[in-house]
Regions:
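Residues lining hydrophobic/aromatic ligand-binding pockets adjacent to catalytic sites
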Residues: 1-194
Length: 194
């Protein structure tokens, strides 16, 4: 990772494309805040043992795209900025990319663009062993690991959420989409403040 001239934002990030696909990870799922609490959105995949992440295909035999779009509409239709981002996000899903890697990369680019973060993403050409690079964040956030890192980085600092009153306050550990739909262009300010 290379930092931008302001020494805060990365200007160049390597994105792992050569690792083996890991089940039960955030590679094909995320959480949004629905009216009854966190809801998992999952992209069904077709994969084999020891399959590289870049080779994992998306399974379109079920109507998961429509279900995902309906879940997003239901959860965020009253969010302040959802209507401004909805069509662009849905276009990514409607494009039905063949590979999970393609969908993930286009979603990351969408989030970078909408938050105003200028960053070059470069897919890796070979697998790099963990902890051999100084700024290796590949395995920090995982559903099966403690969230100490998120707390330490300040990523559980509250921002406005549509269902905060119903949930009894802020709900952490959600997709960056939750931040974007609720904070819109101010998302970058929230990210800078953590």
């Amino acid at each position: 990772m290379t930092l931008s001239p302001d020494r805060v934002l990365p200007s160049h990030v390597l994105v792992e494309a050569c690792e083996n696909y890991q089940k039960q990870s955030y590679r094909n799922r995320c959480y949004i805040l629905a009216g009854d609490g966190p809801q998992m959105l999952q992209v069904p995949v077709v994969h084999g043992p020891s399959m590289a992440m870049a080779d994992v295909r998306i399974d379109y035999s079920t109507p998961w795209v429509v279900r995902t779009q309906r879940a997003l509409d239901t959860a965020y239709e009253t969010a302040a900025y959802y209507e401004y981002y909805r069509d662009d996000l849905f276009a990514l899903l409607d494009a039905q990319p063949e590979k999970l890697w393609e969908l993930n990369l286009s979603t990351i680019r969408f989030l970078l663009d909408k938050t105003g973060i200028a960053c070059e993403l470069e897919p890796t050409k070979d697998f790099v062993l963990p902890d051999t690079e100084a700024d290796d964040y590949r395995y920090i956030i995982h559903p099966k690991r403690p969230d100490d890192v998120l707390t330490g980085l300040g990523l559980e600092r509250p921002y406005y959420q549509v269902f905060r009153d119903r949930m009894g306050g802020f709900t952490p550990r959600l997709s960056a989409l939750d931040l974007l739909f609720n904070e819109g262009p101010d998302s970058i300010g929230w990210l800078f403040s953590v």
